[in-house]
């Protein structure tokens, strides 16, 4: 019974600690968004939709909405159930087709051949070719060779033979001693 009381009191303390914490409010709150402008048929009346400038969004005029011009001027008739691709290359490259010895199967315009710009060739398809390795210090450090023998010389003294035995202990920079 004693263990149960201790366990339940610790559990109650943990629950109180966890449930009484205040939620952290964000320091940045984005500005409130404007509700979309919804026009009813009474407000629009007979004016074409492209003339409305209440929301200040520039729109290109459409001949279908124009009150005088006929809608036959639109020379581009796009099927809404089909995807179209525009390419900056030759128009012959737009149509992707699979050619075999007997027949040609057209697979449509949804896969342009060379319309991707700024793509990087990482040679994933040919793993035999190695990618260039980065040479900056965190990745592949290049060793730095410092020739310390040119900067340091033996202790300058009249007795050079005595210093040959202690040449490792008496190294001073050349900058200090100028002959």
From Swiss-Prot:
Listed name of the protein: Lebocin-4
Family: Belongs to the lebocin family.
Main location: secreted
Subcellular location: Secreted
Residues annotated as glycosylated: 135
Positions of the propeptide removed during maturation: 17-120, 153-179
Record function comment: Antibacterial peptide.
Originating species: Bombyx mori
Modification after translation, per record: O-glycosylation is important for the antibacterial activity of lebocin.
Keyword Glycoprotein attached: yes
Tissue: Hemolymph. Produced in fat body.
Signal peptide (residue range): 1-16
Top-level taxonomy: Eukaryota, Metazoa, Ecdysozoa, Arthropoda, Hexapoda
Induction record: By bacterial infection.
UniProt keyword annotations, A-Z: Antibiotic, Antimicrobial, Glycoprotein, Immunity, Innate immunity, Secreted, Signal
Annotated Gene Ontology cellular component terms: extracellular region
Domain of life, source organism: Eukaryota
GO BP, sorted A to Z: defense response to bacterium; innate immune response
């Amino acid at each position: 019974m004693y263990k149960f009381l201790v366990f339940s009191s610790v559990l109650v303390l943990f629950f109180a600690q966890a449930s009484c914490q205040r939620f952290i409010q964000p320091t940045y709150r984005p500005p409130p968004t404007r509700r979309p402008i919804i026009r009813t048929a009474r407000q629009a009346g007979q004016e074409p939709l492209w003339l409305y400038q209440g929301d200040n969004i520039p729109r290109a005029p459409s001949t279908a909405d124009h009150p005088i011009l006929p809608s036959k001027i639109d020379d581009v008739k796009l099927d809404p159930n089909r995807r179209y691709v525009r390419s900056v290359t030759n128009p012959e490259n737009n149509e992707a087709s699979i050619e075999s010895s007997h027949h040609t199967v057209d697979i449509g315009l949804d896969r342009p051949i060379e319309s991707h710009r700024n793509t990087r060739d990482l040679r994933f398809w040919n793993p035999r070719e190695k990618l260039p390795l980065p040479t900056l210090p965190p990745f592949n450090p290049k060793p730095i060779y410092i020739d310390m023998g040119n900067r340091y010389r033996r202790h300058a003294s009249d007795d050079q033979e005595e210093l040959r035995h202690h040449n490792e202990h008496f190294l001073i920079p050349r900058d200090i001693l100028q002959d």
